[in-house]
Swiss-Prot record:
This is Cytochrome b. Its main location: mitochondrion. It comes from Neurospora crassa (strain ATCC 24698 / 74-OR23-1A / CBS 708.71 / DSM 1257 / FGSC 987). Residues 52-74, 136-172, 248-288, 342-348 are mitochondrial intermembrane. Component of the ubiquinol-cytochrome c oxidoreductase, a multisubunit transmembrane complex that is part of the mitochondrial electron transport chain which drives oxidative phosphorylation. InterPro entries: Cyt_b/b6_C, Cyt_b/b6_C_sf, Cyt_b/b6_N, Cytb/b6-like_sf, Cytochrome_b, Cytochrome_b_C_euk/bac, Cytochrome_b_N_euk/bac, Di-haem_cyt_TM. Its cofactor is heme b. It comes from the Eukaryota. It is a multi-pass membrane protein.
Length: 385
């Protein structure tokens, strides 16, 4: 018997990456998983390397970043890899979620996979926010102040929780220390959740396919077919990431963060990283602080409603024209929210943000179930002819 199939550890690798049977018709849209695994590996390796040279102290944090950039051998490369791969990570995660929404990957028996994926997304956002604070530039300090202050919206105990998180009465040395500790440990928890995500997928029904039908009729092994298919997109990903790292490393960042944190001077606009902008826009669209915070967290958790609200008989939207149109309208609306999150809080951006927020929640609560029922009815009427 081959060692791959007899060794207690290697047979696990074999069952997941070599002999795992996959539907023969899955497209390149199913390659995001391997790309996201690459992103996580890059982030952990570069993150641990950066941690060796970083000083989590309000007096030294900004200077330690400059030390990494100027004095550490290839420190600039490690830092730019870390910051740009974070953007790539979120870009690919949004594509991964969009593919799952379009092809109905949240439907039974993969509901647990979808739920674990949602937890991974929330943890990613928390990790990214903590990491954005660490360079301790202007946007780091004021971003941390604004976002942590959201917790003060909780009645009675909110302000006490905020001061507990800060370790004082404002963002200070204790805050930076605990943010660094959490930012270091969360990616490893994320890696454990990714393994749970894979186990849940492997032990339920395996990968879905573009037709939304059972893939048991025609399956092929993961290696060498999909292994080489994944390698193609991995090489493309490395090429695109390299073009950002070497030629435009700061294009996705904020120039304000190259100014040392100054508690006495507020930046002209406090804006989070681009991948958090849609949820920031939803937060700002609601005048009430507590309701805005609830709406922001609900916007992330809203994707958990899809297994319940999608009542369509066919899996996925590829054969459902009304739902397909609504899905692409939702994608456009999400991009509009992303743009609005970077705009100043003034007319007409406030009104546009409120309209986009209403549409965002309407999609999950009303549009998906109503269109599902209409399409089911149209199928029934056609069948009765």
């Amino acid at each position: 018997m081959r060692l791959l199939k007899s060794h207690p550890l290697l047979k696990l690798v074999n069952s997941y990456l070599i002999d795992a049977s996959q539907p023969s018709n899955i497209s390149y849209l199913w390659n995001f998983g391997s790309l996201l695994a690459c992103c996580l590996i890059i982030q952990i390796v570069t993150g641990v390397t950066l941690a060796m040279h970083y000083s989590p102290n309000v007096l030294e944090a900004f200077n330690s970043i400059e030390h990494i950039m100027r004095d550490v051998n290839n420190g600039w490369l490690v830092r730019y890899l870390h910051s740009n791969t974070a953007s790539a990570f979120f870009f690919l995660v949004y594509l991964h979620i969009g593919r799952g929404m379009y092809y109905g990957s949240y439907r039974a028996p993969r509901t647990l996979v979808w739920a674990i994926g949602t937890v991974i997304l929330i943890l990613m956002m928390a990790t990214a926010f903590l990491g954005y604070v660490l360079p301790y530039g202007q946007m780091s300090l004021w971003g941390a102040t604004v976002i942590t202050n959201l917790i003060s919206a909780i009645p009675w105990i909110g302000q006490d929780i905020v001061e507990f998180i800060w370790g004082g009465f404002s963002v200070n040395n204790a805050t930076l220390n605990r943010f660094f500790a959490l930012h270091f440990v969360l990616p490893f928890i994320l890696a454990a959740l990714v393994l749970m995500h894979l186990i849940a997928l492997h032990d339920t029904a395996g990968s879905s396919n573009p037709l939304g039908v059972s893939g048991n009729y025609d399956r092929i092994t993961f290696a060498p077919y999909y292994l080489f298919k994944d390698l193609i997109t991995i090489f493309i990903f490395i090429y695109v990431l390299s073009s950002f790292v070497f030629f435009m490393p700061n294009v996705l960042g904020d120039s304000e963060n190259y100014i040392m944190a100054n508690p006495m001077q507020t930046p002209p606009a406090i804006v989070p990283e681009w991948y958090l902008l849609p949820f920031y826009a939803i937060l700002r669209s609601i005048p009430n602080k507590l309701l805005g915070v609830i709406a922001m967290f609900s916007a992330i958790l809203a994707i958990m409603l899809l297994p319940i609200t999608d009542l369509g008989r066919s899996k996925g939207l590829q054969f459902r024209p009304l739902s397909k149109f609504a899905f692409w309208a939702f994608v456009v609306n999400f991009l509009i929210l992303m743009k609005l999150g970077a705009c100043h809080v003034e007319s007409p951006f406030i009104e546009l943000g409120q309209f986009s927020t209403i549409f965002y929640f309407s999609y999950f609560i009303f549009i998906v179930p109503v269109l599902s029922l209409i399409e089911n009815t149209l199928v029934d009427l056609n069948y009765l002819k």
